Structures are given as structure tokens and as C-alpha cells.
């Protein structure tokens, strides 16, 4: 997507946005103000492998998959689309990982850095 606005309304559930300085995010490139990641690109993992940590607020079982609503603190809530049924309970630790190739990077104005560098 060209910008955060477009990224936010394409897809269901919508893309997650996390400020790069947020305590739950273990690392991010220096020139990025916010990352975007789609719920289907987040994977529940062990704490040792986690790139992101949160607490489960709610889980919605939908047959082939479950939607996990995760509190990262600081008024940031994200959604993860987990395969299969889940036995996770409210309040459970939610260490998550993702493929960095699936991240979308946005500058402070919400413009995709992939787009801004592609047009220079």
C-alpha cells in the first residue's frame, strides 16, 4: 500500500500498526516511524523467539482459524489470525513472531517507505 490510510482499510481483519518506539516491539529500522503487519503474518511462538510481546485480551474461534486480540500496552491492540483452534485463555502471554519481509514500513507522515523510495 502507498500509505497507512490505504493499508488500514484493505483486508479483513485490518492491518496492525505499531509505533517503532513501542516497548512491545523488540527492534525496527531507524528511519521507520511505524510498522504495519497483517494479522495472518503473525505467529504465536516462544518467548525466546518473540519479536513482539503482549497479553491476550480476547480470542474468537472461527473454525479453521481463531482471531486473537492482543494488548501490547500503551493503548495499542493488535489482531493475530491463528491457524486452527486455540486453547489460549484471556490474560495469557502472547509472544509473537513474524517474517520481516512481510512488514510494511511507514514514515512519520504515514507514507510507505517502499513507495517513497520507489519514486525517488
Regions found by a protein language model. Give the residues of each.
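Conserved beta-strand-loop-alpha-helix hinge in the C-terminal portion
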Residues: 1-11
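Non-catalytic connector elements of ABC transporters
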Residues: 13-16, 23-120
